[in-house]
């Protein structure tokens, strides 16, 4: 399956997931980042209401599960690789199971959960680098799409996020199968998380959780890259509305490093500099964590 199709299905699941935590009848969205999504989901519910005979949240849950099943079937039909990548060193696959279809569905759901978890991580990273008093339509939209995580108090969010990444690490290590890992010693164990004493295994899973957390940096740079390319494309097509939306998105991801009020003063290379710095930071942290996981003392 092409990555763009996979991401589109992830986004479809995300839209119905967020709808479980929102009440459009009691909320008003005067925001170009949100109004289109809300109108689309409202149209879907209006079309299916005579068929489903369900309350809106129950219908959203039903459609969420339907998209997950559809994603699983499409990925299986087109021979997609059933993998979850953590950092640049670890690739996990679904475990062999008697009921293969159920196993693939659960792993497909886990893939989407990882997508949502990384989006939550991006939200926290953006909040950390953004001045508290700064608000924007893009920031409001991002907070909407990470519900219910954005409902939590800011001081509690890092701990909840680390706990979720820790739970993900435990599931990947003890339920899924590690297919490949970047190992300094080719003679070592295929799965370094199951070697050594218990305290060493727990420590290495903790580092895997931190490595999963740093994947938020990768997600941040990917989002920034897409917005930069989309902004250039919109400018070439003279689509002023799309240019404004992309510019606000770039400004959101740059946080306090964005140039405000600097338009019209020549080319701004801040997004590209930010992209390369964050990508370098992500690669450096990833290499350090991989070396710690493969430390001979703990294996």
Model-derived features: positions:
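Selective transmembrane helix interface/packing segments
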Residues: 1-299
